[in-house]
Regions:
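N-terminal loops that bind phosphate or other acidic moieties
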Residues: 1-179
Length: 179
């Protein structure tokens, strides 16, 4: 279903997510409650396990198809010389990942994680955030839709990463805006 408004499809998707499996969550919490250990001695891991059980519908929860998705893009703000690295370094890093020689490749091999690297049109940088929004609504929605390809083929744990010259500047600007 496609709408005339850029984010309507995402709003619809979020509004129609399946409900959490509260029975699976309850079973996991019960397992922790009857375990021979001091109360809440595992800290947040108990809450994380219960959350994963609720959203996966499996108690106890299990991660069998983890995936690391790395999104590579170039930012218009780099024209101000904000990084000592040239913009071409992003494409070089993507090529290194594709060849299996990047650090993320080795981490994924060591921990049996799937890896997908997405080139977000490296030849078309976003707008310069010192002058305008990096993406307009349509561009943002299109990029989000492209990003949803990360889960094509299925995954039960999605880890996200970014790659690109200028990313830390844009992240700092977002942080400053939000907080």
């Amino acid at each position: 279903m496609t709408s005339a408004l850029p984010f309507d499809d995402f709003r619809n998707l979020l509004a129609n997510l399946p409900a959490a499996d509260t029975a699976a969550e309850t079973r996991v919490r019960a397992l922790f409650a009857k375990a021979d250990k001091p109360g809440n001695s595992l800290g947040r891991i108990e809450d994380i396990a219960a959350w994963l059980a609720a959203w996966s519908g499996r108690a106890p929860p299990a991660v069998t198809r983890p995936l690391m998705a790395v999104f590579a893009g170039n930012h218009g703000v780099t024209r101000h010389g904000i990084s000592p690295r040239p913009v071409a370094a992003t494409a070089n890093a993507v090529e290194l990942c594709a060849a299996g020689g990047a650090a993320i490749n080795q981490i994924c091999i060591a921990y049996d994680l799937g890896l997908k690297v997405f080139d977000l049109a490296l030849h078309i940088p976003t707008a310069d955030i010192t002058e305008d929004a990096a993406l307009d609504e349509r561009g943002c929605a299109a990029t989000m839709a492209f990003g949803m390809e990360a889960i094509a083929g299925g995954t039960d744990l999605l880890c996200l990463g970014d790659l690109g010259v200028g990313n830390s500047t844009v992240a700092a600007a977002l942080f400053a805006t939000l907080f």
